[in-house]
Amino acid sequence: MARYTDAVCRLCRREGLKLYLKGERCYTDKCAITKRNFAPGQHGTSRKKLSNYGVQLREKQKAKRFYGVLESQFRKYFDMADKQAGNTGENLLRILETRLDNLVYRLGLASSRAEARQLVVHGHFTVNGGKVDIPSYLVKAGDAVAVSEKSTNSPKFKELKENFKGTVPTWLTVDSEKLEGKVAAMPSREDIDLPISENLIVELYSK
C-alpha cells in the first residue's frame, strides 16, 4: 500500500492552510504553517497566480491530502461518485468521509487521519463486530465501529477513555465509555466542514 512518506508539514505549507495531519501538534504554536506560512522550497515566499487548471489541480491536491489518499485511489473514488445519482462532487466527498480511517478520526478515536489509518492497519477496530484492518473500507449507514475488545485494555485506549474530549458530526453517534460509534446516517454536504470546492475537482476530471 503506497503512502506519502515525506515531512507532512510541507503539505500544509504547500496548500497554504492547516490540513491537521499531525493531530494535537496542529493546534499549537509548533505547527509549521504558524511559523512559516509560505510554500516550501527556494521560491516559496512568492506564490504565483495560478491558471484555471492550476486552481483546479490545487483543489484536488488539497482534498487528497486532507484524506491521505493517493492519485489512483482518488481517481477510483471519483469514478464511483460519477456513476452515482446526484451531484458528483458531493458524492465524492461522501465516499471520502465514509472511509474507515476517516470515521475513526471523526469519532475522536484518533488524533489525526494518519494515526487512525495506522490504528486500523494494526487491527484495533471492528465493524459490526468483525475485525477490519483496511483503512479504505467504506462504511454504511447503520454500521457500528468499535475499538476491539482486546485493544480496549491497551494504554493508548485506556488513556483515550479517561480523557475523551471528542465532538462528533451530526451523522455519527459515539459512546466514549464503550469506545464505539455508529453511522446514524450518510453525511450530507453540510456535514462536511472541510474547505474544499469539489466542483473544481469535477471540472478538472471532466476535461
Swiss-Prot record:
One annotated GO molecular function: structural constituent of ribosome
UniProt-listed SMART domains: Ribosomal_S4, S4
Cross-referenced InterPro entries: Ribosomal_uS4, Ribosomal_uS4_bac-type, Ribosomal_uS4_CS, Ribosomal_uS4_N, S4_RNA-bd, S4_RNA-bd_sf
Disulfide-bond pairs as recorded: none
Domain S4 RNA-binding, first and last residues per copy: 98-163
GO terms for biological process, alphabetical: ribosomal small subunit biogenesis; translation
Keywords recorded for this protein, A-Z: Ribonucleoprotein, Ribosomal protein, RNA-binding, rRNA-binding
GO cellular component, one term: small ribosomal subunit
SUPFAM superfamilies, A to Z: Alpha-L RNA-binding motif
Domain of life: Bacteria
Cited function: One of the primary rRNA binding proteins, it binds directly to 16S rRNA where it nucleates assembly of the body of the 30S subunit. With S5 and S12 plays an important role in translational accuracy.
Record-stated family: Belongs to the universal ribosomal protein uS4 family.
Subunit structure: Part of the 30S ribosomal subunit. Contacts protein S5. The interaction surface between S4 and S5 is involved in control of translational fidelity.
The protein's name: Small ribosomal subunit protein uS4A
Annotated organism of origin: Alkaliphilus metalliredigens (strain QYMF)
Lineage of the organism: Bacteria, Bacillati, Bacillota, Clostridia, Peptostreptococcales
Primary gene name: rpsD1
